[in-house]
């Protein structure tokens, strides 16, 4: 085991650059990359989904068997992503499907077996590949059985004698709850009495298995780590997180500034920097382009943007009742996103009623998302809960002031103007109501109307904040070393 440079296996269900459905994929690419830049040996493992375009280029490095499964044969394929090797666990019956997790909004009925197999194969392959990691870093429920199996199956295996496990909690809402029948391929569950994984007499939760067996646990922001110890924040796992409180830390995710940088962003009509003249000209140009794209009047009014999944978590249900009052003012608002059809229909109604001020774009449009970040003056994130959040960090990089609810990573990353104007980077409210959101939007609008110069000062200050992945990676290294000690 190296004292300074560690060998790390980063296990996830998806990784940006190969396959992505959400923010976990961004972390799975950026964190290993940042750790590699700190001279660590980091290798990523994901399933070999057939929808990965680069799969045909992969090298076969192992063909082997995993006993006691209906489908025992699997291969390990090798690709590189940047400077990181990526091992792909290839087993057609489990991963040769049109999607990763679900089809037609219906989760695959054998997801428990699929990701139990993946977790078991991740550990099974290591001695066969002669890769002996110091740390195995699991992520969310999909890989929750990795720390469990490391302890229960390989606890006395000399190959793993010095290997420790860490699990990251990106969103505790999703726990991976399955019946014992779903995971009967694992002998460890044959007795149907596994307290450190059980959620009832008949079901286990893979996330609990990870939390109760990992050497260290991290949440993706310090505030979220505290929230996980409450019933509301943990969505039913408060006891488990309280039991492991001494091993639970919060590390705020970093930002991939190579993809989100107004100085180099290829989607903007004009790039700009954190220089006042450059920022004012650049943001005004982007606002005009955004207004043209949305068929809104090209005028100097405050622009409020929101890009999100249309779910209750993102606080769209707080925004909707606030819009009728807010849109009486001289403002423009754009919401971009897909998701809940009921929320989408309600947003369409507002757009029909206030067509000169409010636009709803029901789409996932990356180019438009970049333009909204640059062309807006304020960015709305009234989340019900937000483990980390990234859009508030992107917004600050683009000189767009986030309006956030003070939960999770939003609380950790945004400084409220009313609390400390000098160090402000946005506006924060706490009460989970439409009225609290409305009052905060009006606070921002009033400052814009009365003192645009002050708004621009705060925007420039926000642009100078640094949430780079290197800082986060250094914190993860400390966490890994504490696990090893």
From Swiss-Prot:
Residue stretches in coiled coil: none
Molecular-function GO terms, alphabetical: alpha-1,4-glucan glucosyltransferase (ADP-glucose donor) activity; alpha-1,4-glucan glucosyltransferase (UDP-glucose donor) activity
Binding-site residues for ADP-alpha-D-glucose, renumbered to this chain: 20
An individual GO BP term: glycogen biosynthetic process
Enzyme class, first EC level, given as a word: transferase
Keywords from the named record: Glycogen biosynthesis, Glycosyltransferase, Transferase
Gene Ontology CC annotation, any one: cytosol
Catalytic activity: [(1->4)-alpha-D-glucosyl](n) + ADP-alpha-D-glucose = [(1->4)-alpha-D-glucosyl](n+1) + ADP + H(+)
EC code(s) of this entry: 2.4.1.21
Database matches in Gene3D superfamilies: Glycogen Phosphorylase B
Function recorded in the entry: Synthesizes alpha-1,4-glucan chains using ADP-glucose.
Protein name per its UniProtKB record: Glycogen synthase
Species this protein is from: Vibrio parahaemolyticus serotype O3:K6 (strain RIMD 2210633)
């Amino acid at each position: 085991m190296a004292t300074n440079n560690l060998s790390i296996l980063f296990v996830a269900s998806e990784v940006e650059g190969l396959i992505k459905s959400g923010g976990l994929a961004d972390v799975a690419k950026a964190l290993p990359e940042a750790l590699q830049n700190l001279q660590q040996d980091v290798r990523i493992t994901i399933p070999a989904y057939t929808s990965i375009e680069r799969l045909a280029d992969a090298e076969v490095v192992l063909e082997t068997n995993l006993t006691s499964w209906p489908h025992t044969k699997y291969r390990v394929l090798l690709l590189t992503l940047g400077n990181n090797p990526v091992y792909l666990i290839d087993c057609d019956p489990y991963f040769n499907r049109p999607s990763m997790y679900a089809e037609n909004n219906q989760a695959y009925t054998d997801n428990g077996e699929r990701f139990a197999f993946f977790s078991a194969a991740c550990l099974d392959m290591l001695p066969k590949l002669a890769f002996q990691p110091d740390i195995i870093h699991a992520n969310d429920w999909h890989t929750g059985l990795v720390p469990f199996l490391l302890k229960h199956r390989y606890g006395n295996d000399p190959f793993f004698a010095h290997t420790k496990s860490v699990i990251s909690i990106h969103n505790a809402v999703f726990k991976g709850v399955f019946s014992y029948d779903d995971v009967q391929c694992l002998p460890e569950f044959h007795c149907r009495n596994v307290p450190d994984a059980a959620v009832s007499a008949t079901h286990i939760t893979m996330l609990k298995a990870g939390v109760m067996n990992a050497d260290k646990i991290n949440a993706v922001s310090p505030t979220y780590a505290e929230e996980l110890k409450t019933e509301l924040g943990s969505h039913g796992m408060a006891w488990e997180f309280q039991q492991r409180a001494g091993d639970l830390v919060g590390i705020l995710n970093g930002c991939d500034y190579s993809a989100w940088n107004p100085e180099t962003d290829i989607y903007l009509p004009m790039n700009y920097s954190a220089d006042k003249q450059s920022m004012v000209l650049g943001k005004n140009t982007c606002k005009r382009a955004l207004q043209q794209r949305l068929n809104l009047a090209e005028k100097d009014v405050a622009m409020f943007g929101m890009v999100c999944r249309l779910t209750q978590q993102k606080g769209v249900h707080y925004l909707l009742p606030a819009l009728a009052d807010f849109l009486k003012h001289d403002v423009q608002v754009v919401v971009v996103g897909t998701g809940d059809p009921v929320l989408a229909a309600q947003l369409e109604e507002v757009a029909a009623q206030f067509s000169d001020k409010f636009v709803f774009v029901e789409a996932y449009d990356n180019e438009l998302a970049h333009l909204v970040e640059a062309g807006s003056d304020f960015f709305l994130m009234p989340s019900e809960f937000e483990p980390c959040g990234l859009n508030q960090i992107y917004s600050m990089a683009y000189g767009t002031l986030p309006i956030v609810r003070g939960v999770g990573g939003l609380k950790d990353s945004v400084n409220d103007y009313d609390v400390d104007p000098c160090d402000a980077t946005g506006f924060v409210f706490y009460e989970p109501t439409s009225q609290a959101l409305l009052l905060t939007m009006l606070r921002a609008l009033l400052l814009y109307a009365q003192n645009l110069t002050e708004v621009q000062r705060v925007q420039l200050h926000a642009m100078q904040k640094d949430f780079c992945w290197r800082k986060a990676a250094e914190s993860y290294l400390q966490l890994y070393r504490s696990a090893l000690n």
